[in-house]
Amino acid sequence: MEETESSTQTPVPQHGISLASYPVRAVIRMRRKIRTLKKSRLQLDLTGGRSLDSAKASLRRQISMDRATLFKSSTYEKQQYFNFDTPTLEKLALNSQIRKRNRKKSRHVLYPGNVRKCLPVEHKSKAKRCLLLFIGIVCFQILNAIENLDDNLQKYDLDGLEKTLQREVFGQKRAIEKLMDHLQDYLATHYHNKPLVLSFNGPSGVGKSHTGRLLAKHFRSIMDNDFVLQYYTMHNCPNENDVTQCQSEMSGLISEMISRAEIEEKIPVFIFDEVEVMPVALLDVLHRYFQLNQSNEYLNAVYILISNIGGNEITKFVLQNASNDFLNLPQELHQIVISSLQKHHSLWDVAEIVPFTLLEKKHILDCFLDELLREGFYPDHSNIESLAGQLRYYTKENKEYSISGCKQVVAKVNLLQPYT
């Protein structure tokens, strides 16, 4: 009765093995195969007459080979076949992370067991040392050049010149600053690509010729008299009939002085006054020395041209801008003066214009005070006011500008001498 009941029951399916993974099933099959091979080979070896030891060794080799095959099959991943499906962003991110992780894994350095462990020596390139040496040489040359510039400026004592001009030239602060800027830039080195040509322009009595005399005195004290030339047109070439002779004399003086200066590595200074009355033939001679297409020694020279050309234009400009600070309008004033100079001669195309403006009454008082002290008079303020009141002035916007500048100051002071 019990047998019939048990036979009628439905058999329970064996899910234990079917649920196992593929490597587990492979292990089970291999174990069964090993048992069968053991039995079959032992029987064959015993029946064939082989020794038991050789049979065991053969069996061990077979077992080891089977285990290796089993390990490969258990770690084998399912092959991925190529298809044309576009990978998703998640797969791409996962692959990039795997690659980065593999890249970060540092390779271990294998050291022999009987030596000291140390990292391999990195061979440094010698180009870096050469580059550092080259940079050092360039920096040294730059510092040396800067020191040479300072030496040149000290040789000409431009600081002392600037102090002298500020002390003895009144009412021309802007002109002095511009003059010193040009001299400092040019005299800082001995090698140039063009000569320095400066043009002092302004009305009469504002200090142009006085500045020229101070420049000549200063450079004669720094250099010899052989390297400074003062040329007054009315004195050196008074007759128009002697223009040809004046041309040869001027050319000879300039060439000889430049040659001597080049030998001693000095820069000569040529000061030409009263240029407004200089004949055109002499202006042409000067113009040839201002050109760029000449030998190097002629490029190392300073030429100063002093004239009243453009004085009327400067006077009108100052009176029209009396209410403003016309010192802040240098470009407009420069254009007015240069247009007047270019009508006179083309040599001013290469000149640096330094305009001298009108002097106010306070500057005339300074001129009288300086002249009185120079002549040994007691500087009485009331006496100075009386002398300054004898001059004529332009009156504009509550400002008084002297018509004749400081030109009559010396004559007025000389009139006081008989009464002392």
Curated annotation (Swiss-Prot):
Residues where ATP binds: G202, P203, S204, G205, V206, G207, K208, S209
Gene3D superfamilies: P-loop containing nucleotide triphosphate hydrolases (3.40.50.300)
An MF annotation (GO) of this entry: ATP hydrolysis activity
Membrane topology, record value: Single-pass membrane protein
SUPFAM superfamilies: P-loop containing nucleoside triphosphate hydrolases
Compartments it resides in: Membrane
Transmembrane segments: 130-150
Principal subcellular localization: membrane
Organism superkingdom: Eukaryota
GO CC list: endoplasmic reticulum lumen; membrane; nuclear envelope
Keywords annotated in UniProt: ATP-binding, Membrane, Nucleotide-binding, Transmembrane, Transmembrane helix
Family: Belongs to the ClpA/ClpB family. Torsin subfamily.
Name listed for the protein in its UniProt record: Torsin-4A-A
Gene (UniProt): tor4a-a
